């Protein structure tokens, strides 16, 4: 039996429940706690059925058990408003926080673009940007590594059913955090993000549009090659990530049209926005877990 790093999840909503399914397949991560605030929550009930310990008393219900249960990595899938306090409490117990809210108090992580940069930095909080950011920033980065991007704009369209109450409360944070990461991680000088929640029924698959204004005449061949290379990188952990059209060149504008189909772990396959977020978080946590298991990373209580 390979040793695994024990994890806890805060937030038993759409994202937390989908992430739980992914962690159970991980070779190096073992989910042991699910934390919520509603004793009747479907996510807590599902976690209990899987034999995972649960509390409906929020983070304060988890903290006393973290050391005894050996929890070293905690995922926060709640809301930007409560994340800072959650992170402070968890870090004080010497556990690493992976933030799936748009709070962004820690550095951004978009695995195919900058996961390797986080190795060896002993960070105690990393932020997974947003679902729209995880889907589109790799494409902005694919263009910006070929030539400078003066402006990057993304439009993420998600089905209404896949956007839970936490996502809806965080729309402003979504746009701000995603725009910031388009600049910091994607490499655009100026970023803008738009989210559209589509109420169509049956629900539509996640769709993303990426526009980049490059400086000078676009190097079509190099940009196209870079986009296809990046596509393959994302598909390693999100197989349903597809390039529907593009890159389309119009003057100095480069446009890419994407579709993200999920694995259907919790919500059906149209909810690719859950998948890309949870798969990226699991991938990031696995990298930290591998470092801990190899003795290269020792977590210190904050």
Swiss-Prot record:
By its UniProt entry, which InterPro entries does this protein fall under?
Acetaldehyde_dehydrogenase (IPR003361), Acetylaldehyde_DH_C (IPR015426), NAD(P)-bd_dom_sf (IPR036291), Semialdehyde_DH_NAD-bd (IPR000534)
Please name the catalytic residues of this protein: 131 (acyl-thioester intermediate)
Tell me which residues bind NAD(+). 162-170, 273
Catalytic reactions of this protein: acetaldehyde + NAD(+) + CoA = acetyl-CoA + NADH + H(+)
This entry's Enzyme Commission designation comes to 1.2.1.10
One Pfam match, given by its short name, reads Semialdhyde_dh
Query: Which EC class is this protein assigned?
Result: oxidoreductase
Record GO terms (molecular function): acetaldehyde dehydrogenase (acetylating) activity; NAD binding
Q: Which GO terms describe its biological process?
A: catabolic process
| This protein's UniProt keywords | Aromatic hydrocarbons catabolism, NAD, Oxidoreductase
The family assignment reads: Belongs to the acetaldehyde dehydrogenase family.
Name of the featured protein: Acetaldehyde dehydrogenase
